[in-house]
């Protein structure tokens, strides 16, 4: 992909753990590579299809100096986060933040941290069977947007019977396709935080829930940890999930089963 490179932008700020760093300040140096398609900007001379690097450098300087953080990791992360928010056309970003005056009391050229993030497509299943179910789904989607997660597509809302053997009210279910620069684990933590904010209490396994947010796919990632399994292990067993998925992404291929969603849906429906 095409790349814009910004190298060694110098800024003065008051980041650091030591009191002297927060009182006296020091020099920091930022370099970054931003990846996006430059075709429209190059052929149509359209600045809106590009990143105005002069404005971006000014924004970085403003953002960098408006707070005093203990860790350069925090500052670098915030620069990446706000750049993605301000420039939706950027698909990937690698940013290095150097701290050449780091107080280590040894001969040193610089210390630096590098944060590398790439936008990914993910699918999230939403469900609710308590209160105003459709309103709960809408609130969850609004909270995703508020966190900078771009909603690409929304399936229709389905009324479905509960899954898992616990007697309870029917569900309103939906699947959304999103674009996010958050890694899978961070995206999961975001979903759990939204559930908590909306009042979900985990008492009965597969029991009634005000809101349920399940991470189904993140691109073609296959992942198994104590906290997260990708793809979601029950996708091929849940007709309501497949029905919603095939509505918005029928040709998406399950990375383990190697079948498009529409085939999995047709097979389970039979």
Swiss-Prot record:
Keywords assigned: ATP-binding, Folate biosynthesis, Kinase, Lyase, Magnesium, Metal-binding, Multifunctional enzyme, Nucleotide-binding, Transferase
- Residues in the signal sequence: none
Pfam families on file: FolB, HPPK
The name under which this protein is listed is Bifunctional folate synthesis protein
Cite the InterPro entries for this sequence: Dihydroneopterin_aldolase, FolB_dom, GTP-CH-I_C/QueF, Hppk, Hppk_sf
Q: Which family does it belong to?
A: In the N-terminal section; belongs to the DHNA family. In the C-terminal section; belongs to the HPPK family.
Task: Describe the task this protein carries out.
Answer: Catalyzes two sequential steps of tetrahydrofolate biosynthesis, the conversion of 7,8-dihydroneopterin to 6-hydroxymethyl-7,8-dihydropterin diphosphate.
Its annotated pathway reads: Cofactor biosynthesis; tetrahydrofolate biosynthesis; 2-amino-4-hydroxy-6-hydroxymethyl-7,8-dihydropteridine diphosphate from 7,8-dihydroneopterin triphosphate: step 3/4; Cofactor biosynthesis; tetrahydrofolate biosynthesis; 2-amino-4-hydroxy-6-hydroxymethyl-7,8-dihydropteridine diphosphate from 7,8-dihydroneopterin triphosphate: step 4/4
Query: Which Gene Ontology terms describe the biological processes this protein takes part in?
Result: folic acid biosynthetic process; tetrahydrofolate biosynthetic process
Q: Where is this region: HPPK?
A: 120-270
Q: Where is this region: DHNA?
A: 1-119
Can the keyword Transmembrane be found in this entry's annotation? Answer: no
Tell me its EC number(s), please.
4.1.2.25, 2.7.6.3
Which amino acid positions bind Mg(2+) 1, per UniProt? Answer: 212, 214
List the catalytic activities from the record.
Answer: 7,8-dihydroneopterin = 6-hydroxymethyl-7,8-dihydropterin + glycolaldehyde; 6-hydroxymethyl-7,8-dihydropterin + ATP = (7,8-dihydropterin-6-yl)methyl diphosphate + AMP + H(+)
Q: Assembly and partners?
A: Homooctamer.
Write out the residues that bind substrate.
21, 53, 72-73
Q: What is the lineage of its organism?
A: Bacteria, Bacillati, Bacillota, Bacilli, Lactobacillales
What is the protein's species of origin?
Streptococcus pneumoniae (strain ATCC BAA-255 / R6)
Q: Which residues bind ATP?
A: 160-163, 171-173, 192-195, 200-215, 227-233, 238-240
Binding annotation for Mg(2+) 2: 212, 214
Active-site annotation: 99 (proton donor/acceptor)
